Amino acid sequence: MIQPPPRYRAIIDTGATVLGSARVSSVLSTATVGTALCAFALRNTIGGPGLLAILVVLVLLVGASLAAQWGNIGWRALVPISLMVFTLWSWLTIFWSQYQWASLAALSYMLVFTVLGIYIALVRDTIQIVRTFGDVMRFVLVVSIALEILTGLVFDTSFKALAIAGNLGSAEPIQGIFGSRNQLGVIAVIALITFATELRTKSLQRGYAIGSLVLAGVVLALSQ
């Protein structure tokens, strides 16, 4: 096997140490969840190419991070056979789809997030994953309700870039930064489960966890 020169070897070892560290894994996990939850807002503000660039960079970084700590990673659960079958079936639908290129683009998008999700599952334990989702969901819910207050109560206008109609002052369902009330409602329900898990596992201060539950409950009610 060809060995790199010593000076390059030192750089490679340093890079592997950094990319394989717990801090980098935490940052990449948070960035992945944040990108997934903010995909609509990102696509509407920086465009599809901008979102694609973010996803490509994330895939490259998580691939390098996974390679750097491969020896320390073990499968923590059984292989999700049902998910694998669903993914395979989804890809097979390309052959009889009337919109093959659109199907290929959508399935590639799904595959990217599948890879990113597998990375999180491999490098973080359950409590760490819950905390990652909890932190990101608190952020997106606070941003959503803040923008709804600004558009619906303060300025009484819409925010077309994020499809926020400013309905808070008219008692109509709000959309937040997710583009639709249904999407916001789903995120709020997931947030409620996540925050309740944080409270039960005591992975977050009690007052902070209860406040998060109240926030998610309010957002869920306003999205109906």
Per-range role (PLM):
Residues 134-162, 169, 176-224:
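Alpha-helical transmembrane segments of multi-pass inner-membrane proteins
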Residues 60-73, 118-128, 194-204:
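Structural signal for the C-terminal ends of transmembrane alpha-helices
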Residues 1-92, 128, 135:
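Transmembrane signal-anchor hairpin modules in multi-pass inner-membrane enzymes, especially those
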Residues 26-34, 82-84, 107-108, 184-188, ...:
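Short hydrophobic alpha-helical membrane-embedded segments
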Residues 94-148:
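Transmembrane alpha-helical segments and their membrane-water interfaces
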Residues 52-62, 105-117, 182-198:
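Hydrophobic core segments of transmembrane alpha-helices in multi-pass, intramembrane catalytic enzymes
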Residues 35-39, 61-62, 87-90, 113-116, ...:
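Hydrophobic, membrane-inserted alpha-helices
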Residues 37-55, 92-109, 148-184, 221-224:
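Membrane interfacial helix motifs at helix-loop boundaries and amphipathic/re-entrant anchors
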